[in-house]
């Protein structure tokens, strides 16, 4: 095993965003989030977003954890979404990951994340021509094709350094008990942990600001509550922030049933 390659799947997943002009007839650049397992080179997630926002990661990461399990660490850069200069503080994303026992490891340079950087080049070299030939110009349709291409990359394309497909390397590690992956938990807080949370106080009118409206909450004026903005765009209001020792007390949601 090479020194710089993790021996077990789930030890370290490299995560990065790559802004690029993906659509050949558009001058706009969009970020693509990519994540791969350091041991097997399996793509655990690849998706385009309008912008690189906290909500983008709150959409991207739980989907990967549900599909593949929870790794021990994510290898990231010093973007403010991941890093705070206060050593005793966590970003909202860092806090969400810690809630599910996942830590962050910071790459000192872009070159230190060479594996995921090379995979950016793979997508940049392939997708614009593919989207042109398939006449794809909408992000939702593009992401459906990216899912299929990621599956093909994992299962069918032999990795030059591993001399086998990433999926075969992943399966081989599992067979040899070289895995530290944990299942995504059945947790009542799951949807709220992966949301942008804002502390609020109920106003003197018994209402709180939710989106462009002020809506009534069944709590006395002055009560502290937590507003959650979910990746889907809907809102929830909780009586308290996520706490593994408690159950969520949902005061409001506009999520369609």
Task: Specify the residue positions occupied by each region the protein language model found.
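Mobile-element integrase/transposase regions
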Residues: 1-43, 54-63, 67-70, 98-99, ...
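Acidic/histidine-rich, metal-coordinating catalytic segments
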Residues: 61, 65-86, 107-110
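A generic structural motif
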Residues: 49-50, 221
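Short small-residue beta-strand/loop micro-motif enriched in glycine and branched aliphatics
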Residues: 41-46, 105
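Charged helix-capping and loop-helix junction motifs
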Residues: 87-92
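C-terminal, beta-rich DNA-binding module of retroviral/retroelements integrases
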Residues: 150-257
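Charged alpha-helix within mobile-element recombinases
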Residues: 93-184, 231
């Amino acid at each position: 095993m090479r020194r710089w390659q993790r021996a077990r799947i789930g030890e370290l997943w490299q995560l990065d965003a790559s802004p690029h002009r993906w659509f050949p007839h558009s001058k706009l650049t969009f970020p693509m989030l990519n994540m791969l397992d350091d041991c097997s080179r399996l793509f655990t997630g690849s998706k385009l977003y309008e912008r690189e926002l906290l909500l983008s990661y709150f959409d991207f990461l739980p989907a990967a954890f549900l599909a593949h399990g929870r790794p021990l660490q994510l290898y990231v850069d010093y973007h403010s979404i991941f890093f705070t200069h206060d050593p005793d503080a966590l970003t909202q994303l860092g806090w969400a990951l810690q809630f599910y026992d996942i830590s962050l490891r910071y790459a000192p340079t872009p070159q230190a994340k060479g594996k995921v950087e090379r995979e950016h080049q793979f997508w940049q070299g392939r997708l614009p021509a593919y989207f042109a030939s398939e006449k794809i110009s909408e992000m939702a349709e593009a992401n459906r094709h990216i899912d299929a291409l990621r599956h093909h990359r994992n299962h069918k394309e032999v990795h030059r350094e591993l001399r086998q497909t990433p999926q075969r390397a992943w399966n081989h590690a599992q067979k040899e008990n070289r895995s530290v992956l944990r299942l995504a938990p059945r947790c009542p807080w799951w949807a709220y942990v992966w949301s942008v949370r804002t502390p609020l106080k109920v106003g003197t009118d018994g209402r709180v600001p939710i989106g462009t409206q002020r809506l009534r909450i069944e709590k006395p004026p002055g009560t502290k509550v937590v507003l959650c903005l979910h990746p889907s765009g809907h809102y929830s209001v909780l009586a308290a922030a996520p706490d593994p020792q408690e159950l969520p007390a949902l005061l409001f949601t506009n999520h369609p049933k």
